[in-house]
Amino acid sequence: MPTINQLIRNTRQPIRNVTKSPALRGCPQRRGTCTRVYTITPKKPNSALRKVARVRLTSGFEITAYIPGIGHNLQEHSVVLVRGGRVKDLPGVRYHIVRGTLDAVGVKDRQQGRSKYGVKKPK
């Protein structure tokens, strides 16, 4: 506990909160161009081939973004919309690609949770 004189000499510093998605620069989403589309393996104890893309954002950042859902049409030079949100078992992946916007099509034959994968209501 500081004394009154210590508090007069230098005041208490406010706690600065660090953003979990710095590349978005305070925006809800950002547009970017895929520079590489590839798969990586998750950390223990999980096992899979997770689809990710290296994306150069309009803010100038080069980030790794996860491609959610089963199957995708993304390739190099695809223009995508990126939102925040990490993937727990992929270290360094702190962003998600938004399906159903720009060049990323929605997930085919998706019935439930459609809004998260950019799928229109089936007729």
Swiss-Prot record:
Keyword Transmembrane helix carried by entry: no
Protein localization: Plastid, Chloroplast
Primary residence: plastid
Molecular function in Gene Ontology: rRNA binding; structural constituent of ribosome
Gene3D superfamilies according to UniProt: Nucleic acid-binding proteins
Gene Ontology BP annotations: translation
Domain of life per record: Eukaryota
One Gene Ontology CC term in the entry: small ribosomal subunit
Job of this protein: With S4 and S5 plays an important role in translational accuracy. Located at the interface of the 30S and 50S subunits.
Protein's name according to its UniProt entry: Small ribosomal subunit protein uS12cz/uS12cy
Biological source species: Atropa belladonna (Belladonna)
